UniProtKB/Swiss-Prot annotation:
Composition-biased stretches (Polar residues): 627-644, 723-736
Chain residue ranges for the region called Disordered: 607-647, 716-739
Keyword Ribosomal protein on entry: no
Domain of life: Eukaryota
Record's protein name: F-box protein YLR352W
Native species: Saccharomyces cerevisiae (strain ATCC 204508 / S288c)
Keyword match Heme: no
Keywords, ordered alphabetically: Ubl conjugation pathway
SUPFAM superfamilies, per the entry: RNI-like
Length: 807
């Protein structure tokens, strides 16, 4: 009995000794694995996984209980109105939980059925416009994402829409996916009228009285009833957008070119099936709009969807090639990882060998559209050329890797949509070259007839191809060939889309059906939980932008960009002063960031050197600041220092006279002249909020303060007063007195110490242990998935998955 008691006490003391941050990371991995156990993806399985996590960890100790609350309440998946009502009552009873909610997901909400109708739901009043607004007011301190769907479109009145679009909150991701109808449209128009009170001016010259600098992601997918002038007003209010989904909306040519402001951070854009947009407007947008053409933009496009309906489109081959060339001209081809040009006609040459490649200023020139994409889009991982009839031989040439003489053009394509291709049919789908020509390809999307042919081959619904070591040889040696297995993905929830994927033991398993339908128990009768994820290739097949960060963020980079966390919390459990944290309350961004500034030259001065001070009375005074420089240049001082008789006893540090720095306090008056009054009003409001709530100064305010920048400009860039007195033998910046040994040691140091997150972009260079290749492969896959998460996100459950993967 004493032994049992001592063991219990030792385990409790051990649990208390572990820092909560470490426990948080461990439980985060468990929480992520359980919620990704989503094959097949049903609401019952989600609730079962959540219940398993709560029962396993909630009652261990106080630390586990607090961490479970942080993880569970962060992402609120509201599937029924009754669940929403229960959550609202819980928040009213415990206000500390309000700060833990970051995501409100209504995309799977439905309560119609089981004997209920929409009229009965209105009478129950579990979820109405009043209760929804009350929920938003309670969670405004830390709510980052609001994901709606068509099932709550009638509950989104003008007060809710005005509240969502108004500045002063940390809400960064807004998705109205599928919302339409007369009630929703009238509410949207009424809410926007409050931001555009002056109706006497032409609607295309109107400016909002307030702008929201916090919202970075906006989804209007399938909002078909919103008029074009309403879209104009919405886009004018959001100058800091990074992700914009306008798929299947009523946007027209004028709104596309004149209504979109100059977004410098845009990375994701979807203009799919916008029937009122002409090819000319799209080409003018990609040719002249500063969002695409400005070389000073912070980001370039990484995700682009311009697919159209082929039989009702006026696009031709010249338009498509012109669009691709404009993407290359403005540098987007170097960062694009997703490109959907389904329905756009492509020019197909008889053979790549008959279409010579010539290098020009911005791109490799050729006539064939596929060859142009192959040579000029090296980072592309997902490509859709749906509706184009391309021969199998041309597809094989396109997927075949480029020679090693051009390493910068190496292809990384993983997903290819060739549905609607008349050459890929039930007679040609079994061509083995289509499955073995590309080492990086993991999935193909084909038409139903082709997919059904593979499904009927055997009971396992798979096809096995062989990759030979000498594919060009007449005699094939199957004993040395590599076996490649491709399988049909069967899931009835995705409508009319059919995929073939290459199986592997980690990301795209071939035993999904057998494992998901099998329940196992141990010898004591406890259920064995086996994590079965959806295939990883589905994230490349999505046609809708994933706006948020998902159930559990896999990388801090995406969260930092989407949420604009300028001052992230030091800990989930302790604040910056060391006290117990009940939830992070970040400050919203209500003012634009300062312009980029300009280069200046600052002259070094040595306060401790009296000779230099005396000599300045005999020589011409050198101005403290020069005018802005067009490019960074340093002035040489070798000749002047040797010719100056007063500089005989000057220390080596004082010989460094000129320094170059980037002055962020220089304002672009022309850019800010129209916004000066508005910024001052927003700054006054922010000061009032800070005074009332006693908030601390944010890092953004501290680093972008012009007074701070001017004080910094008076500091010595190359030497401080302490270093001058203690170090008299500073090496020369020109390299005249530096030794080769120090240079070699510095180069060796740089070679051994990689920059932060280096292996996320170069996973193939990572080696965990030369004797353990399996663990090395797992690490490489992890780095690759985290890097892809920044652009593609992850395939979640619910209505988002339906809209993202539907036909």
């Amino acid at each position: 009995m004493p032994d049992l008691k001592s063991k219990t006490l030792s385990s409790q003391s051990l649990g208390a000794a572990i820092p909560p941050e470490i426990v948080y990371q461990i439980l985060t991995y468990q929480f992520r694995d359980l919620l990704r156990n989503d094959h097949p993806g049903t609401a019952e399985k989600f609730n079962e996984n959540l219940t398993t996590f709560v029962k396993s960890n909630l009652t261990v100790n106080k630390t586990f209980s607090h961490i479970c609350q942080v993880l569970i309440y962060r992402y609120c998946n509201l599937t029924t109105a009754k669940r929403f009502h229960g959550l609202l009552q819980t928040l009213k009873g415990n206000r500390c939980l309000c700060n833990k909610i970051e995501v409100a997901d209504f995309q799977e909400l439905t309560s119609i059925g089981l004997g209920r109708s929409s009229e009965m739901n209105k009478m129950i009043k579990n979820l109405t416009n009043e209760t929804l607004l009350e929920f938003l007011m309670l969670t405004k301190a830390n709510l980052r994402e609001f994901l709606a769907c068509e099932n709550i479109q009638d509950d989104l009145d003008d007060n809710i829409i005005k509240y969502i679009l108004s500045p002063g909150k940390v809400l960064s991701v807004v998705d109205f996916c599928g919302c339409s109808g007369t009630t929703f449209t009238e509410s949207f128009i009424k809410a926007l009228d409050k931001y555009y009170p002056n109706k006497s001016i032409d609607q295309y010259r109107l400016e909002p009285i307030q702008q929201n600098y916090q919202i970075t992601c906006l989804g209007l997918n399938d909002c078909i009833d919103l008029p074009s002038h309403v879209l104009w007003k919405i886009l004018k209010m959001l100058p800091e957008l990074q992700k914009l989904d306008l798929s299947h909306t009523s946007i027209d040519d004028s709104t596309l070119y004149h209504g979109i402001p100059h977004w410098k951070n845009l990375t994701h854009l979807s203009l799919a099936t916008c029937l009122q947009v002409t090819p000319r407007a799209v080409l003018e947008f990609f040719s002249h709009h500063p969002t695409i053409t400005d070389p000073d933009n912070t980001s370039t496009l990484e995700w682009l969807n311009v697919s159209v309906i082929a039989h009702s489109s006026s696009w031709n081959e010249v338009h498509t090639m012109f669009l691709l060339k404009k993407l290359c001209q403005h540098g987007h081809n170097k960062t694009l990882q997703y490109l959907n040009i389904g329905g756009l006609p492509l020019h197909v040459a008889p053979s790549f060998g008959e279409d010579p490649i010539s290098e020009s200023t911005y791109y490799y020139q050729c006539r064939d559209s596929l060859q142009f994409i192959k040579w000029n889009f090296p980072k592309l991982k997902s490509l859709s050329i749906k509706g184009n009839s391309i021969p199998i031989s041309t597809l094989v040439e396109f997927l075949t890797p480029i020679d090693q003489d051009h390493p910068n053009c190496a292809q990384k394509l993983k997903f290819l949509n060739i549905s609607g291709n008349s050459y890929v049919n039930k007679w040609t789908i079994q061509d083995s070259l289509l499955y073995t020509c590309s080492p990086s390809l993991v999935a193909l999307e084909v038409s139903f007839d082709s997919w059904q042919q593979i499904e009927k081959l055997n009971d396992r619904h798979e096809i096995i191809a062989y990759r030979y070591k000498n594919p060009n040889s007449v005699i094939k040696d199957i004993s040395t060939a590599e076996q490649v297995k491709w399988k049909c993905y069967i899931d009835s929830s995705y409508g009319r889309r059919y995929w073939l994927y290459k199986t592997d033991p980690f990301l795209n398993r071939d035993d999904l059906d057998s494992k998901s339908n099998l329940t196992r128990y141990d010898f004591e009768g406890h259920k064995i939980i086996e994590i079965i994820n959806q295939p990883d290739f589905l994230k490349f097949a999505q046609s809708k932008i994933m706006l948020g960060c998902g159930l559990v963020p896999q990388s801090g980079i995406r969260r930092k960009l989407c949420y604009r966390d300028l001052k992230p919390p030091v800990s989930q459990f302790l604040n910056r002063k060391g006290a117990i944290s009940l939830g992070d309350t970040p400050l919203p961004i209500i003012t634009p960031t300062l312009p980029r500034g300009g280069w200046r030259i600052i002259h070094n001065e040595d306060d401790n050197n009296s000779h230099v001070e005396d000599s300045q009375n005999h020589v011409n005074a050198i101005p403290r600041r020069n005018s802005l420089l067009s490019r960074p240049t340093l002035r040489s001082n070798n000749g002047s220092s040797s010719a100056n008789p007063f500089a005989i006893n000057v220390s080596p540090a004082s010989q460094i006279r000129d320094g170059l720095y980037w002055d962020r306090s220089v304002h672009d008056l022309r850019e800010l002249s129209l916004q000066e009054q508005r910024i001052q009003e927003l700054a006054d409001e922010q000061q009032e909020l800070r005074t009332i709530a006693n908030f601390e100064e944010t890092d953004d305010e501290y680093l972008h303060d012009p007074d701070l920048q001017r004080r910094r400009s008076q500091l010595h860039l190359f030497e401080s007063s302490r270093s001058r007195s203690g170090n008299k033998t500073r090496p020369s910046l020109t390299g005249e007195h530096s030794s080769s040994a120090s240079f070699l040691s510095f180069s060796h140091f740089n070679h051994l110490h990689k920059r932060k997150n280096y292996y996320f972009t170069h996973p193939d260079e990572f080696v965990y242990d030369p004797k353990d290749p399996l663990t090395t492969q797992r690490y490489r896959l992890h780095f690759e998935i985290v890097n892809e998460y920044q652009v593609f996100g992850c395939i979640e459950r619910g209505m988002y998955r339906y809209y993202s993967l539907k036909a």
